[in-house]
Amino acid sequence: MDENLSIDESMIPYYGRHYAKQYIRGKPIRFGFKNWALNSSDGYMLQFDVYMGKNAESVPQGYGVGGDKVVDLLTKANVPHHKGFKLFIDNYFTSVKLLRNLASMGICTSGTIRDGRIEKCPLRPIAAMKKEQRGSSDFRFTDDGKILVVRWKDNNVVSIGSNFDTNDIGTCKRYARGQGAIQIPQPKLLQRYNQGMGGVDKMDQMVAVYRSRIRQPTRGLNPEEG
């Protein structure tokens, strides 16, 4: 099992009638069955759950709908604890509380995080950072030093939390009007997150090449009728 894992949603296209069919605006596959998938960084799926509606989700464990699903998938996939596995998730799942729990399990985790889930972490406000130049950043550790939250300004402002990574700064290439390619500061935490997060997308790309079409069942003729 690859040490780098990621959890994300994956869509199976379907245009027939079914109570579990979802519509997600703005996605490459807008109609179909939504799955929560746990994948290795090379695209192999380790575990998945088909989304059947809010009322059919996992038993609440106190981390919110997304966070509970993370714990559920890791448990079903029998991901070993304290073995150096790294998990990358997006802001649907991440909370400081979840990061603490996964740290206690020895699962190193980084994930983009919504402003309402950072537990009043005193970072510079998003509205203020939107006015700053690209590459600006801010960070804070929790009082016990176990959870790091970083906020970075690119075209938009993004926040990311981690229970294992550091706040060191690297650079990334961006294009500026009238200047061409330029280098701007970027937290290495975000660079490592971007490298580790693509397992589900890679699987979707490979599946799309050999996808089988799902047809809606049709009612056959009854020979006794007519």
Describe each model-derived feature in a short phrase.
Residues 1-226:
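Acidic, contiguous segments within the catalytic cores of piggyBac-derived transposases
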